[in-house]
């Protein structure tokens, strides 16, 4: 009697090529989480992880020939586009910043970037920043309240948070009289991170508490698509500038982005100031860590305008 072969396999299912949609354009986004742990990440992305996300690493800073290693913290904001404002599009992605435990200096180390309690940044001579010499006359406009040197990456991170929380500038210029006016309550304009040292120890409590202040807020970002040398494409975001929700004129954002691209930044990334829409591309490898919930393993490459940085 001929026996039918016995298979110890279930029937399975039809195989299909997985193509993840990529999007390009301006979009208001909700912030769902910041540096989520393993359980939170699995819930957000409806997936299972073999290991917990690691947000700490090291990187090199400084000019060629005089580089040094410093601690680095990756800050991942998991964001989702507002479908009511994006023609039904629900884009789930990340806005990533890298903070280095080093201060940001110019090329000859004569100036350092500083930040005040209002989250305003500028460049000052090192002596002026330390308080060992007076502020130059041409910099007297800068409010030095609780001023301190800024970490590399802090300015961009602070700007994102200010735009997300809809924090006002402490002053504005009357368009008719050109007179500078201050808001009634300057405390409303305060915006500075005070526990950054904790980030390099893996403690992101300050950031997690910040996004809870206005959980229903949205911030506008410019999203794009980056193409690698092997023709793979990934979701990208312009992290140098974000906009408050009520802003509808994107010309300055576009001008800034175009100037940076002309200087050599984002050489393989395409951006648009049109409303968010699907970017038609071929299938790519979405097993790459850059498109996964754990994120990229290292910081993005440097750009021509990046200032040399010194250790803290």
Model region roles, listed by residue range:
Residues 1-312:
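Short beta-rich binding modules
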């Amino acid at each position: 009697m001929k026996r039918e072969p016995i298979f110890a396999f279930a029937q399975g299912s039809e195989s299909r090529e997985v193509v993840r949609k990529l999007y390009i354009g301006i979009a208001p986004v909700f912030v769902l989480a910041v540096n989520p742990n393993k359980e939170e990440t699995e819930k957000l992305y409806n997936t299972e992880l073999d290991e917990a996300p690691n947000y700490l690493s090291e990187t090199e800073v400084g000019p060629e020939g005089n580089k040094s290693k410093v601690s680095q913290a990756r800050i991942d904001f998991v964001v989702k586009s507002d479908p009511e404002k994006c023609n039904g599009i629900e884009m789930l992605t990340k806005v990533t910043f890298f903070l280095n435990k080093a201060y940001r200096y110019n090329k000859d180390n004569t100036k350092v970037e500083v930040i005040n309690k209002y989250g305003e940044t500028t460049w000052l001579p090192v002596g002026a920043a330390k308080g060992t010499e007076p502020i130059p006359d041409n910099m007297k406009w800068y409010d030095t309240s609780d001023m301190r040197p800024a970490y590399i990456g802090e300015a961009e991170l602070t700007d994102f948070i200010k735009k997300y929380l809809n924090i006002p500038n402490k002053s504005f210029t009357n368009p008719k009289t050109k007179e500078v006016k201050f808001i009634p309550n300057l405390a409303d304009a305060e915006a500075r991170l005070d526990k950054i040292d904790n980030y390099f120890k893996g403690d992101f409590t300050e950031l997690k508490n910040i996004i809870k202040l206005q959980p229903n807020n949205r911030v506008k970002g410019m999203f794009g698509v980056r193409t690698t040398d092997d023709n793979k494409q990934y979701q990208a975001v312009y992290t140098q500038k974000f906009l408050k929700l009520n802003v509808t004129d994107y010309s300055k954002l576009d001008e800034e982005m175009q100037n940076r691209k002309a200087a050599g930044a984002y050489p393989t990334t395409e951006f648009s100031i049109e409303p968010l829409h699907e970017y038609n591309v071929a299938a790519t490898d979405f097993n790459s860590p850059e498109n996964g919930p754990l994120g990229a393993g290292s910081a993005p490459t440097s750009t021509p305008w990046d200032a040399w940085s010194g250790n803290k």
